[in-house]
Every structure is written in structure tokens, then in C-alpha cells.
């Protein structure tokens, strides 16, 4: 039985995803397979290529013939070079950068927001309560300023009185 390593197509019309499979050469593209040995997603940047190297080496050693596209994938991953004993067995596979975790993104957004929203939801009750609170705080602040001013005046007058009493 002639065995081939080929691509089995998955996905929607313009978003192809492939499985790298081992199947009889006479079966349809999406027909029955012997073993699934990897995946290939060409639309990602960089393309996602995950092939089980051990299984690919086994099937190549027992005589499975890769199609042209699978042979190109095996060269990128370095499996073809391992099989043939050629230098450059590490391949030229590009790996996508790791994305930050959602928890890290959340914590970063939380720190940027200074631990709270900048604007509150406003309803009539909340608006009145906020205005009353602001008025009360303003009155307290004004009273505190008056008390501080009176204290400052008293302290300014007291040394003058002491100086006058010393002169007399």
C-alpha cells in the first residue's frame, strides 16, 4: 500500500486550516486517514506549523512519501533535514511572540485608571447628594480657613501687645 503524508483541509472558504495526515495515496483529500501528525494554519502571521517530529520521522523511515507542500513544511520544521541527514536540522520555523496574559493586561489597565473610574454614573439622587456633599465640604473648608486666619491674626497681635507692654 502506497502511503502519503499530505494535507487535509479544514476551515471556512477563505480561512483554510490544514491537518498534516498520513493516508493511503488513493484516498480523497479529506478522506479516511491513518494518523494525524500535525497542523498547519497559513493565515496566521507567522504561519502556525506544529508537526509531531517523532511520528513524521517514523512515517518517513517506513517509506511514506510527502506531497510537495508537506515536504516544504517538513523542511521549515527541520524534519526533512533530519531524515535525509543534511545539515541545518534546526529548520527555519518562525515563532510568534508570546502575548501578555489577560490578567497582566487587566492589572495594567487598572493601574492606568488610578484605581477607580474618573466619572461616576449620575442620577438625580446622586447629583443632589453630591452637590450637598460638595457644599458641606466647601463650608467646612471656609470655616477652617476663617479659624486659621483668626488664629494667625491673634498670634500677630499678641507679640505686638507683648512688645508694647515691655516698652511701658
UniProtKB/Swiss-Prot annotation:
InterPro entries registered for this protein in UniProt: Ribosomal_bS16 (IPR000307), Ribosomal_bS16_dom_sf (IPR023803)
This entry carries the following GO cellular component terms, namely: cytoplasm; small ribosomal subunit
What domain of life does the UniProt record list for this protein's source?
Bacteria
Q: Which residue stretches belong to region Disordered?
A: 110-168
- Keyword Ribonucleoprotein attributed: yes
Q: Name one GO biological process term.
A: translation
What Gene Ontology terms describe what this protein does at the molecular function level? structural constituent of ribosome
This protein's UniProt keywords: Ribonucleoprotein, Ribosomal protein
* UniProt biased composition (Basic and acidic residues): 129-144
Q: From start to end residue, where is composition biased (Acidic residues)?
A: 153-168
**Does this UniProt record's set of keywords contain Ribosomal protein?**
yes
Q: What NCBIfam families does UniProt report for this protein, alphabetically?
A: PRK14520.1 (NF011093), S16 (TIGR00002)
Q: HAMAP family, alphabetically?
A: Ribosomal_bS16 (MF_00385)
Quote the PANTHER family the UniProt record gives: 30S RIBOSOMAL PROTEIN S16 (PTHR12919), SMALL RIBOSOMAL SUBUNIT PROTEIN BS16M (PTHR12919:SF20)
Q: Which family does it belong to?
A: Belongs to the bacterial ribosomal protein bS16 family.
Designated name of the protein? Small ribosomal subunit protein bS16
> What is the organism of origin for this protein?
Corynebacterium efficiens (strain DSM 44549 / YS-314 / AJ 12310 / JCM 11189 / NBRC 100395)
Taxonomy of origin reads:
Bacteria, Bacillati, Actinomycetota, Actinomycetes, Mycobacteriales
